[in-house]
UniProtKB/Swiss-Prot annotation:
Organism: Conus stercusmuscarum
Disulfide bond keyword on record: yes
Source species taxonomy: Eukaryota, Metazoa, Spiralia, Lophotrochozoa, Mollusca
InterPro entries documented for this protein: Conotoxin (IPR004214), Contryphan_CS (IPR011062)
Domain notes: The cysteine framework is C-C.
Identification of the protein by name: Contryphan-Sm
GO CC term (a single one): extracellular region
Propeptide residues according to the Swiss-Prot or TrEMBL record: 24-54
Signal sequence coordinates: 1-23
Misc remark: Exists in two forms, due to cis-trans isomerization at 56-Cys-hydroxyPro-57. The cis conformation is the major form.
Length: 63
């Protein structure tokens, strides 16, 4: 009876690890996603976006 219990536990562990490994393969769907437009307002918006990210030397000008 003890060997049967160990066999069932080993089978359960193997199945659970298989499910975990196969479950991770479904996650990276974001790589194929269309990149979003970070600068919808064109070149001027891109410039202002860069200034906002790295800090603007003059706050009233940066908005």
């Amino acid at each position: 009876m003890g060997k049967l219990t160990i066999l069932v536990l080993v089978a359960a562990v193997l199945l659970s690890t298989q499910v975990m490994v196969q479950g991770d393969a479904d996650q990276p769907a974001d790589r194929d996603a269309v990149p979003r437009d970070d600068n919808p307002s064109g070149t001027d918006g891109k410039f202002m976006n860069v200034l906002r990210r790295f800090g603007c030397p003059w706050q009233p000008w940066c908005g």
